[in-house]
Regions:
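Short, Asp-centered acidic motifs that coordinate Mg2+ and/or phosphate
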Residues: 1-2, 87
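Active-site donor/metal-binding and catalytic loop motifs
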Residues: 83-110
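A short, conserved alpha-helix in the catalytic core of glycosyltransferases
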Residues: 45, 50-61, 66-93
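Short, hinge-like loop/turn segments at secondary-structure boundaries
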Residues: 19-24, 105-108
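Structured catalytic cores of enzymes that bind and process phosphorylated ligands/cofactors
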Residues: 3-6, 27-30, 50, 57, ...
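A recurrent flexible, glycine/aromatic-enriched loop bordering the glycosyltransferase active site
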Residues: 30-52, 115-118
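Non-catalytic, C-terminal membrane-associated alpha-helical segments of glycosyltransferases
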Residues: 108-164
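Short beta-strand-to-loop element that shapes/binds the nucleotide-sugar donor at the catalytic cleft/hinge
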Residues: 3-21
């Protein structure tokens, strides 16, 4: 199987990365699994601290080259679950790491050129990579995701309003 070591913020000690359990297979909505003293089975794993057994590696190989910054860890863990391998969140925090994800969209004050650049940036919204991932694992949400990514880019004030 795969073992996920969760991390917490060094100052606040709050969860930053680890595992997520999907609420329903085929839908992106999930629940963050905070270490609670027991092993918890998950579907999505952040690879900040990750142990992949040789058995899994021999079947799945390495992370996909489709992704340049993020998403590859989620792709890998979902592929493992799909192949019948368990993915476990360890019962305790294994390290400290600040959440270094940038904003999920740029504000209205940004120029359209900046927002479109952010849309396609691997460290921004990673448009092509995000859509590849969604098409592969959550195909029923593909069109919705495409609309959301463009809505965030073209009309960030609407997205800001909707997220309140």
């Amino acid at each position: 199987g795969i073992y996920v070591g969760s991390t917490c913020d060094p100052e606040t000690k709050k969860y930053t990365y680890g595992g997520i359990k999907l609420k329903q297979w085929g839908k992106r909505a999930g629940t963050i699994l905070v270490p609670n003293g027991t092993y918890q089975q998950c579907d999505l794993a952040n690879a900040n601290i990750l142990m992949i057994s040789r058995t899994v590696y021999n079947v799945l190989g390495s992370f996909s080259n489709e992704y340049t910054h993020g998403i590859a860890d989620f792709d890998y863990s979902l592929s493992a679950v799909k192949a019948g391998f368990p993915v476990w969140v360890l019962p305790f925090y294994c390290g400290e790491c600040q959440n270094d994800h940038g904003p999920s969209w740029l504000p209205q004050g940004s120029t359209l050129k900046q927002r479109i650049k952010y849309l396609y940036s691997p460290k921004g919204l990673a448009y092509k990579q995000q859509l590849h991932y969604i098409r592969k694992f959550f195909p029923s949400e593909y069109n919705e995701m495409k609309i959301k990514l463009w809505l965030k880019t073209l009309f960030p004030f609407i997205w800001t309003y909707l997220k309140k």
